[in-house]
Amino acid sequence: MAEAHSALWGLVEEFVVGEQDSRSAEVAAGVKDGIFTVLQVVEALGSCLANPEPRSRAKGMQLLSRVLLECYSRLTEKEVEVLVLFYENRLKDHHLITPHVLKGLMALSMCDVLPQGLAVSVLKSVFQEVHVQSLMQIDRHTVYMIITNFMKTREEELKSLGADFTYGFIQVMDGEKDPRNLLVAFHIVQDIITKNYALGPFVEELFEVTSCYFPIDFTPPPNDPHGITREHLIVGLRAVLVSTSRFAEFFLPLLIEKMDSDVQSAKLDSLQTLIACCTVYGQKDLKEFLSGLWSSIRREVFQTASEKIEAEGLAALQALSACLSRSILSPDAEDLLDSFLNSILQDCKHHLCEPDMKLVWPSAKLLQAAAGGSSRACWKVTANVLPLLLEQYNQHAQSSHRRTILEMTLGFLKLQSRWLDEEDDNGLGNLKEALCTMVFSAVTDSSTQLHQVAVRTLTVLAMQQGFLSSSDIDLVVDHLTRLILQETDSESCMAAIEASGTLAKVHPSVFISRMLPQLCANLQTEPMDINLNESRVVPERFIRQRCLEALAAVSTHQSILKETVPILLDYIGRVHNGEGETNAENVVSICRSLHRVAVQCQLDSEALQFYHEIVLPSLLSLTVQAATQDSGTSCNVLLRDDVLTAMVPVITAACTHLTPELASKSVSQVVALFLDGDVSLFSENNLPSNFQPFQVNGPTELQNHLVSLLMAFVCSLPRNVEIPHLRRLLQHLLSLSLSGCSPFAYSSASKCFAGLINKCPQGDLLDDILQVTAQRIDVGLVDEPSRTRAITLLVWVTKALVLRYHPLSGQLTNKMIGLLSDKQLGPSVANMFSLLVSDSPDIINKACHADIRIMFRQRFFTENVPKLVQGFNSANRDDKPNYLKALSHVLNALPKQVLMPELPSLLSLLLEALSCPDKVVQLSTLTCLEPLLQEAPETLKVHIDGLISKLVSLTLSPAMAVRITALKCILALTKLPLHMLLPYKQQVIRALAKPLDDKKRLVRKEAVETRCQWFLLGSPGS
């Protein structure tokens, strides 16, 4: 015991006299280990704490407070009581001691065993004895933390202080300037208000002590380690200012003043804060200031050049309208919403009638914003404005004016449909005839711009149940059909197709009876003689394409789906039978339409089941028949690579959302078809039984191509769906992948094999298959004729395993890295690294339920980039571009935050990649560099000379994409510190003169912006 006592005294003396700061940690460790107690530490510090020299006393308090910060959770209630009284007394000591006393009090404020009443005692002492704003920032922060800790754990005690607590905190905060402390202080004020601490007579004082920071004007210093932004402070202060309506009488005049200032950021902050206020303030709070608020908002919308400020002004007006709409009116109370809307109508309505229409749009936007606040506001504004707009439409003959008026009408109708659903309540009943006359005349006008607005307006009117009569709906659909089939303007046609898709959900029977027959008739029309066809306004091929798009668009209701899907499949059947045009491009277009229909069905299980049960058998039946018939017939169109590629997403989309029962039933039939030629999936009885898609060479060569459809099916099923005969299927796919079939067939087989491997459960089957696969790939890489097939299989299997973190993925990736030095395969292997880290569009992706682990790219980067760098350094000159290309593909797929820490070690390699003659390497490297350039000035400092030289030379590259991206990189450099760029300013400006005359407009556009920014470097205000 005596030995421990002696050791403690020794440690204390070494800390206080010997200035050995590390001794405080040893003392704290002794307390934690129970070697001595905190009170023994106080006793050991006795002579030091009683020393007449303030610095010695400060040193003693520093040691004690450090120990308390480490050991506060071990203190007993009695120890805490003694220490609190001691520390409160120390607050009266010399100012040098105060910071250390506050640290100790912060430690004590975190003690769970703090006796009742001591929190109040501590805060009273702090408020009375400490002039907080004369302290250093860190010590002021300590005071805020003491208050925060007590507010979390001793709320009721603090509330017993009443308004004295609020007044004490006001004194603490008054004059605070440091953003770190302000964030904490704002949070404390918000808690004082929201947790109902007594404000007493100090409401205005509390407002003043916080509102003096509004609006926030803060720019964080470069490389600020604290990471505090202006936005953090804005959000913190805004939460305070809008936390109580008791601030309204003080804050709203300030808001109006700041909205009228010339500082754009102040306007923006004020408008956004007003929006937040409207969720808390009530009618009585706003009443006195409505006129001033409206004047300020109106001025901003009428006069501002900033779209952002205009948008926030309109949002603020809508928030005011919503706020005034929420209050419940007593019979004798003034309706503030009504009077407020009257003011807006009075100031804006007459602008809608001005002949020059200069202020039409600002006025319409203001009126629509006010109407957007509530159903009551919407009813009043639209009842006043819509008759006026209808009148103006008839008075203006110019299409441009009519379009403007119709667009405004559309805006108000959208508000009507949002707030006022029922016909009896929406106020449009007496305007129905005039509205229909206006819109139907617009949709037949000669102006295509007017057509587009009219179509959108018709859509809004027809979506309101019961508003239009059945004959009106028929007329709407007829107009849409006419625009689709006859309109020369493609945008008007697309607007009609989009509107048809929207309205078909609500009026399916009308579309079935009126639009579908015309679409079907035009789709099946035979191509006419070219001389007879010249009189057609819209070429035949465009009409066919439009019909296909429209059929897909309207397939949003199950009853329509049952009509459109057979029409589309029938067209493919006619191609198969050699009827009409046997055009692969048309079949591809139909497949795109079928794909869109499938995507639209995915959230409707009944529609998806119907689609799946009719489309999958039909496509497989037609293609199997085509593959098993004599070659040379027209049906071979269905076996073309581009047609089968277009069918893949159709089947994929039809299978990704299947129910487990339907998926299991289908997979057994499809696998039986491909493995055994079992045609029971098809309803036809005349199908041949000689379907052998895994047999290589001979008459079945075309059948190999259909493995792409098998891939689309089995690789898109959920992982919990069991694939029957999986081992046998994988063996066949593996053999086909390495056989002498066509590139399309062996690529499809490799992808299908990889997709199944990715989802295959861990176990003997997976281990056996992978072992055999690795061996056969090795053999294939040695055999000259099969090397390309082997590398295709290798990259897909590697991708499948990389995504699921399989142990074998590292071995296969190493094999690919080694092949970068292969003279024959090196360039193609380098390109395949892009496939390893990018998202695959057709298989092994999230939509197809692939096994994809989080952050697989980061893991791939960490494990393999060092190997690529090492391989580059040891490779001969001819092989180095392969390593650079592989590296640039990997880096380009990574998020910026992952790349930044690695940039110093990789930058020299990236610069070397810019000198590589391969355009793919150049573009990939530039794309990777662009977002990083402005983030690492210290790293770039060493390389800036070479970087600028290489980027400037690439602005003259033969490849347009390289020229544009190089210019974007040079533009990104302007964000670097000025001192780094000024020595190169004139060099870059001279070099950028050539891209200004580039033959491509996009390059010239980028060059102009880049050169302007370099011109401005170093100029005032830049």
From Swiss-Prot:
Gene Ontology BP terms: DNA repair; protein maturation
Keywords of the record: Cytoplasm, Cytoskeleton, DNA damage, DNA repair, Nucleus, Repeat
Major subcellular site: nucleus
Cystine connections: none
HEAT repeats: 858-896, 900-938, 941-979, 982-1020
Lineage, uppermost ranks: Eukaryota, Metazoa, Chordata, Craniata, Vertebrata
Protein name: MMS19 nucleotide excision repair protein homolog
Name of the gene: mms19
Subunit structure: Component of the CIA complex.
GO cellular component: cytoplasm; cytosolic [4Fe-4S] assembly targeting complex; nucleus; spindle
